[in-house]
Amino acid sequence: MKVSLFATCLIDLFYTNAGKATVELLERLGCEIDFPEAQTCCGQPAYNSGYVKEAKEAMKHMIRTFEHADYVVTPSGSCATMLKEYPRVFQGDREWESKAKALADKTYELTQFIVDVLKMEDVGAKLQGRATYHTSCHMTRLLGVKEAPFKLLKNVKGLELVPLPNAYQCCGFGGTFSVKMGTISEQMVDEKIEHIEEVNADYLIGADCGCLMNIGGRLKRQGKPIKVMHIAEVLNSR
């Protein structure tokens, strides 16, 4: 099965290990990985900031870049959501709406792809410790992927997965929200960290790098020993 990887900006710039883990994991599960080097940002930051015209140019470029892909898989619920939104953005545009839908229909978040397409829930991962999972807003509320990460994590050998209190509460990142509303964002992430500490977790696992960067950065500034891991890294652990 041939899979085209959409790496995302944050993985390219800050979380390269999560990108490598994604490739290694999918290859081990029998996928042939294609990485279109022309890929860029999906346009979400510009679109959410009101720069619709500029965002559409980025979206058109992405549509062209992945036009011939069989499957597009991304280790980001947020960016997968944005690609799924393309048909709505181009609604009424005769040239681009159908092309946008074609891309949206073959786009999957990583855990969604493994569970729903590859039909696997145990990938042979091993990681010792106690962990909790941060449920990101875009991935659950907009993309609708809720159970897939848990189905995979519960089969990681040696990992004790404990529920996170107020799991569906935002971590305060929200893309440009964390920049524009810094004080509120800080209060939100502090509350999230309190909940993580309540369960005495060794690891905080998530599927969106924006959330992990926000929570992980705050943990580091506070000198907390909790390790933050992208779910791809966990599933690739041996």
Swiss-Prot record:
GO terms for molecular function: oxidoreductase activity. Coiled coil: none annotated. It holds the Pfam family CCG. GO terms for biological process: lactate metabolic process. GO terms for cellular component: cytosol. It comes from the Bacteria. Belongs to the LutA/YkgE family. Is involved in L-lactate degradation and allows cells to grow with lactate as the sole carbon source. This is Lactate utilization protein A.
